[in-house]
């Protein structure tokens, strides 16, 4: 099973890793906004160069990014076909067996492809450089003011942290079950789509049981340690901004202004 899109945190000592997670979340959100408001070649070139700089600074493996993009190749192909069939904007460039291909369709395909690649790449880098604990701490710290009006931010942060932790665990468990089935002679690559789906059904029951077992073990461990979302808890690592964090805020805001103008 391809889990490139759901990357694990890779602990390294880089500039990107050492940024405050709140700054990284803000940067990623605004980068995604810039990706979808960008339209011309210069704007996308700025975003691509920024992404390349982040990849280099974070020491993220290019091969890992390529594998992540491959994971959404079917989605890109599907959206491209939709543009070819339904996008009638622009002039007719080609005509094959009565099927007209418009310039607007090709432009739409180019835009959606670049946007998909940039979105996946920035999310993969973010997940590889920010641990689940840092993400939840950043959310809890940023939205802590809502706790005063009765919104259970601590509970939400706990649920998010456990969810992020369980995703790679479930994927590893799925791979283990699939390997066990393959060793017994099962072949998940042969047959029609319906047959492939039926072959995955026997995986669901042991996966469901294993997931419940892991969840029960986690709940027991938290209960034994007296964990509570209502009490005041100290932090092992206190979030604190530094100069690089403020610089990242300024950088993404400047880039956004350049793209809008």
Task: Describe these PLM feature segments.
Residues 1-41, 47-58, 144-151, 155-158, ...:
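Transmembrane alpha-helix interface motif
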Residues 13, 36, 59-64, 96, ...:
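Membrane-helix interfacial "entry" motifs
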Residues 24, 62-73, 245-248:
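Alpha-helical transmembrane segments and their helix-start/interface "positive-inside/aromatic belt" motifs
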Residues 49-56, 69-77:
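Small-residue-enriched core segments of transmembrane alpha-helices in multipass membrane transport
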Residues 66, 70, 107-111, 201:
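Alpha-helical membrane-interface segments at transmembrane helix boundaries
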Residues 68-72, 76, 113, 117, ...:
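Loop-to-transmembrane-helix entry motif
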Residues 73-186:
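Juxtamembrane/interface alpha-helical elements of multi-pass membrane proteins
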């Amino acid at each position: 099973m391809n889990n490139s899109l759901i990357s694990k945190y890779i602990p390294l000592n880089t500039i990107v890793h050492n940024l405050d997670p709140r700054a990284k979340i803000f940067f990623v959100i605004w980068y995604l906004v810039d990706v979808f408001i960008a339209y011309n070649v210069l704007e996308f070139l700025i975003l691509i160069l920024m992404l390349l700089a982040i990849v280099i600074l974070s020491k993220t493996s290019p091969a890992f990014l390529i594998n992540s993009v491959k994971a959404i190749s079917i989605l890109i192909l599907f959206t491209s076909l939709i543009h070819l069939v339904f996008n009638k904007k622009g002039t007719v460039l080609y005509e094959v067996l009565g099927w007209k291909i418009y310039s607007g369709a090709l432009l739409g395909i180019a835009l959606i492809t670049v946007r998909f690649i940039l979105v996946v790449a920035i999310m993969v880098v973010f997940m590889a450089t920010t641990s689940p604990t840092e993400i939840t701490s950043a959310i809890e710290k940023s939205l802590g003011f809502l706790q005063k009006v009765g919104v259970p931010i601590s509970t939400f942060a706990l649920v998010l942290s456990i969810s992020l932790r369980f995703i790679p665990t479930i994927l590893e468990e799925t791979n283990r079950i699939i390997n066990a089935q393959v060793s017994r002679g099962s072949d998940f690559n042969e047959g029609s789509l319906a047959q492939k789906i039926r072959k995955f059904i026997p995986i669901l029951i042991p996966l469901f049981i294993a997931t419940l077992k892991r969840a029960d073990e986690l709940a027991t461990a938290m209960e034994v340690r007296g964990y509570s979302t209502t009490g005041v808890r100290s932090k092992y690592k206190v979030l604190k901004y530094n100069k690089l964090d403020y610089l990242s805020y300024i950088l993404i805001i400047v880039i956004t202004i350049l793209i809008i103008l």
